[in-house]
């Protein structure tokens, strides 16, 4: 979990509304260069205006889900159109992803619970 603005292991705790992009992928067997590119994208996204945090999970079956939290839809669009990110997207389509979906959701409410230690 990338903690930038009140993000927790289970999501973002903070001022609503905000937006979430949900990137669900099924990987191919060709992962050459993937980790390096993913690390670079994480570095870049952390520097973006409006980026609030990220969480990811990956299964042994190649299914991966990454949720990024954003202040506005304009911030999401700016990231989508970042030149280095666009190049990485092309690489993903050409080499690493068998399939993917991107969903964008507005978060109007968060509810959480944590058992005291």
What are these regions (language model features)?
Residues 89-92, 96-98:
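Short arginine-rich
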Residues 1-63, 73-81, 97-117:
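Short S/T/G/P-rich N-terminal loop/turn motif that feeds into the first structured element of a domain
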Residues 66-70:
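Conserved RNP beta-strands of RNA recognition motif
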């Amino acid at each position: 979990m990338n903690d930038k603005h009140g993000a927790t292991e289970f999501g973002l705790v903070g001022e609503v509304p905000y937006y979430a992009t949900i990137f669900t992928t099924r990987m191919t067997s060709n992962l050459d260069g993937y980790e390096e590119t993913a690390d670079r994208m994480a570095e870049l996204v952390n520097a973006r205006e409006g980026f609030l945090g990220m969480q990811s999970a990956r299964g042994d079956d190649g299914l991966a889900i990454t949720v990024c939290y954003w202040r506005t839809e304009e911030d999401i669009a700016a990231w989508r159109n970042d030149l280095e990110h666009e190049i990485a997207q092309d690489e993903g389509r050409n080499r690493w992803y068998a399939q993917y979906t991107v969903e964008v959701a507005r978060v109007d409410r968060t509810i959480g619970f944590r058992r005291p230690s």
